[in-house]
Amino acid sequence: KEKAYQLSQRGSKALIFARAARKTQKAVVDSTNLTKIRAGGWYGNDTIWRSVVDLNKILLHADSAGVMHAAPQRRFFSVIDGIVAGEGDGPVLPDPKYCGVLLAGFNPLAVDICATRLMGFDYESFAQFSRALNLNKYVIMPYDVSAIRCRSNMPEWCDILHQEGSMLEFRPSTGWEGKIEIRSAPNRNKSIV
């Protein structure tokens, strides 16, 4: 019991420290006028999508020795915990968004596309999706986006890839505002798929 109490106390102190650190970081960012772009978090950054696509290729196509193969080497089940998500300037300074959502599926790209759309963003505006959907080698999703089927206990969410508007209305990171939202995306007047 004493050990559990000590761990509990340590966890409480860590949480208090994390909150204080977040407030300090936010104050520094605000006072130095770094609110538009920081840590590479802007729409034109052409690096992170490459890492995301490469990690997904490795996840699916690398064997236990790290050798890449054309055929997937393992089955995959993706779970996104969106019970309390983060919006705005994440992942460093996100604001909590209480959504009460769990997403899951057998393809990482398909699950991410559905999550992106549920958040109110146009997946076609993200380089990681457009590049990953057009791979010729080490294919991540071996079918077209139109083949994705969303199932939900919320009937209005079952057709999210074909609906206009935002479901959860997430606020994008500052460097992405006006670039990825469904309402501002170039294809906003047509079906998403």
Give the ranges of each region predicted by the language model.
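Extended, low-polarity segments enriched in aliphatic/aromatic residues
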Residues: 1-193
